[in-house]
UniProtKB/Swiss-Prot annotation:
It is found in: Cytoplasm. It catalyses: ATP + H2O = ADP + phosphate + H(+). This is Holliday junction branch migration complex subunit RuvB. The keyword Cytoplasm applies. GO terms for molecular function: ATP binding; ATP hydrolysis activity; four-way junction DNA binding; four-way junction helicase activity. Pfam families: AAA_lid_4, RuvB_C, RuvB_N. Belongs to the RuvB family. The lineage of its organism: Bacteria, Pseudomonadati, Pseudomonadota, Gammaproteobacteria, Pseudomonadales. Its EC number is 3.6.4.-. The RuvA-RuvB-RuvC complex processes Holliday junction (HJ) DNA during genetic recombination and DNA repair, while the RuvA-RuvB complex plays an important role in the rescue of blocked DNA replication forks via replication fork reversal (RFR). RuvA specifically binds to HJ cruciform DNA, conferring on it an open structure. The RuvB hexamer acts as an ATP-dependent pump, pulling dsDNA into and through the RuvAB complex. RuvB forms 2 homohexamers on either side of HJ DNA bound by 1 or 2 RuvA tetramers; 4 subunits per hexamer contact DNA at a time. Its main location: cytoplasm.
Length: 348
């Protein structure tokens, strides 16, 4: 199974990127949720504009689908400058990065998505560019090779990553502003869904928006994807308007339950409960039992289930929590009740 095959995958798809551009907010006052990040960035941007300086280099990290690319574009819009976008895997050689840097205008934003995937040789070129606005490049080969320095206009590097821990210390230390994006509340997601529906011209009531929001796993990208699929259902099997009942029927048909779990999530939890007595069980045993790759479970399925408190990682292996039993209407084993082996851990 590939992450992007799932309806509730947080990672984006090429076609969605095009569709999402139409509904992305362009200014900070249109940006919903993340109140601390929004307030801080408004302050930093206003200060930089007041001094007629480029904004400090900014690192944005957090789970996929929370709006890192959107925020990078908003920063450029608020600063009144252009944004040049690329990603870590695309910048294979120092020359690739040099070409982008030398085409920047003063105060422009260079956005690098998946910045944790930059190659070491490209990263070395980035250090003096970030710190001194200079580009060190080698001319010639062998004994005749020499280094020359090119001055760059002051610019803002905005880096986005889902894995901040994989950044090297020298790179991380060169960012003056570091922002973490958190999962969204159902209330904020409902506001996002309502806004998107308005832009797309979809009739929808507040309860319909909330029904979509509560199944979107705290992620705007998933919420907008579910909205498009519910729209299809409403147009074909309903009267076009998205109500709570229509959203509920559509999402049940799409196999997304009220917690945002799909078939793969439920299969993982039920396998642990039915075949391994709730655990502890090793990752390799789970992978063999459900026919998935180890890394798929670890990187795709587990994170949200752990974040929601349905699975625990213990020194002896994975264990489901009492929330998993309650979700399926099953009796809770004694070890998850008060005084049981996993009761204290389950409450943490």
């Amino acid at each position: 199974m590939i992450e992007t095959d799932r309806l509730i995958a947080a990672s984006g798809r090429d076609r969605e990127e095009v569709q999402d551009r139409a509904i992305r907010p362009l200014r900070l006052d249109e940006y919903i949720g993340q109140p601390v990040v929004r307030e801080q960035m408004a302050l930093f941007i206003q200060a930089a504009r007041g001094r007629n300086e480029s904004l400090d280099h900014t690192l944005i990290f957090g789970p996929p689908g929370l709006g890192k690319t959107t925020l990078a574009n908003i920063i450029a819009q608020e600063m009144g400058v252009s944004v040049k976008s690329t990603s870590g895997p695309i910048l294979e050689r120092p020359g690739d990065l040099a070409a982008m840097l030398t085409n920047l205008e003063p105060h422009d934003v260079l956005f690098i998505d998946e910045i944790h995937r930059l190659s070491p040789v490209v990263e070395e070129v980035l250090y003096p560019a970030m710190e001194d606005f200079q580009l060190d490049i080698m001319i010639g080969e062998g004994p005749a090779a020499r280094s020359i320095k090119l001055d760059l206009p002051p610019f803002t590097l905005v880096g986005a990553t889902t894995r901040a821990g994989m950044l090297t210390n020298p790179l991380r230390d060169r960012f003056g502003i570091v922002q973490r994006l958190e999962f969204y509340s159902n209330k904020d997601l409902a506001t996002i869904v309502s806004r998107s529906a308005g832009i797309l011209g979809l009739p929808m009531d507040d309860k319909g928006a909330f029904e979509i929001a509560r199944r979107a796993r705290g992620t705007p990208r998933i919420a907008n994807r579910l909205l498009r699929r519910v729209r299809d259902f409403a147009e074909v099997r309903g009267k076009g308007e998205i109500t709570k009942a229509v959203a509920d029927m559509a999402l049940n048909l799409l196999d997304v339950d009220e917690r945002g779990f799909d078939h793969s999530d439920r299969r993982l939890l039920l396998t642990m409960i039915e075949k391994f007595d709730g655990g502890p069980v090793g990752l390799d045993n789970i992978a063999a039992a459900i026919g998935e790759e180890r890394h798929t479970i670890e990187d795709v399925l587990e994170p949200y289930l752990i974040q929601q408190g349905y699975i625990m990682r213990t020194p002896r292996g994975r264990v489901v929590t009492r929330h998993a039993y309650l979700h399926f209407g099953l009796n809770i084993p004694g070890r998850f009740c008060e005084g049981g082996e996993y009761a204290a851990q389950d409450d943490e």
